[in-house]
């Protein structure tokens, strides 16, 4: 049960096994990459770039946290394989906005759960890494938007869900596709550093 955002964040950062260690490595790597960009490129030293970095960092952390209740080998949060991803996939049968999605989940996805579950888990982990490290963020944003659309439509009719939550996530991920937040204190900025360097006068005159 959640208590408050501060104690819950502290618990998230200090409890758990290997997943907490990996998250800390991603977090420290993100900070280190941001510092390197900030030091190398004066154009990165702006409030806008810092905000873009924090935005993708937090959304990346969201996807990482969401992957924790669908860990292999069961891809659920119970040793017997119940709950977790299997439960929420089942909820889409009842909550999907359109019958075609509900039928697909019922007839294709659930009967082949262990084919689709690793793809969902891997997708969320890769998405979290992409956004936290600022690497291939357009691809990460596009993948995140698709996953959010699936959640928005798949759980739309459930009274326990607020559809706007997923819709806002779609909007944010599309903004990542459009504005390439990895160019703000991320690995995308380091990789594209030479390309983005200003053209010299000699180069312009030539």
For each of these PLM feature ranges, what is it?
Residues 126-130:
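Transmembrane-helix motifs of polytopic, lipid-linked glycan transferases
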Residues 1-97, 103-123, 133-206:
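Extended, low-polarity transmembrane helix blocks
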């Amino acid at each position: 049960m959640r208590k408050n955002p501060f104690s819950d964040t502290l618990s998230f950062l200090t409890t758990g096994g290997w997943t907490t260690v990996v998250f800390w490595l991603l977090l420290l790597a993100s900070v280190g990459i941001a510092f390197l960009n900030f030091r190398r490129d004066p154009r990165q030293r702006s409030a806008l770039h810092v905000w873009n970095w924090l935005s993708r960092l937090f959304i990346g952390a969201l996807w990482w946290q969401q992957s924790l209740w669908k860990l292999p080998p069961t891809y659920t949060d119970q040793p017997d394989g119940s709950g977790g991803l299997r439960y929420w996939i089942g909820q889409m049968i009842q909550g999907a906005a359109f019958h075609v999605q509900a039928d697909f989940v019922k007839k294709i996805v659930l009967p082949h759960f262990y084919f689709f579950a690793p793809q969902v888990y891997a997708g969320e982990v890769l998405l979290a890494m992409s956004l936290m490290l600022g690497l291939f963020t357009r691809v990460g944003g596009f993948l995140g938007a698709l996953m959010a659309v699936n959640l928005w439509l798949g759980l739309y009719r459930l009274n326990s869900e607020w559809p706007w939550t997923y819709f806002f996530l779609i909007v944010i991920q599309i903004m990542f596709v459009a504005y390439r937040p990895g160019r703000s204190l991320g690995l995308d900025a380091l990789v594209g550093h030479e390309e983005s360097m200003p053209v010299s006068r000699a180069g312009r005159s030539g």
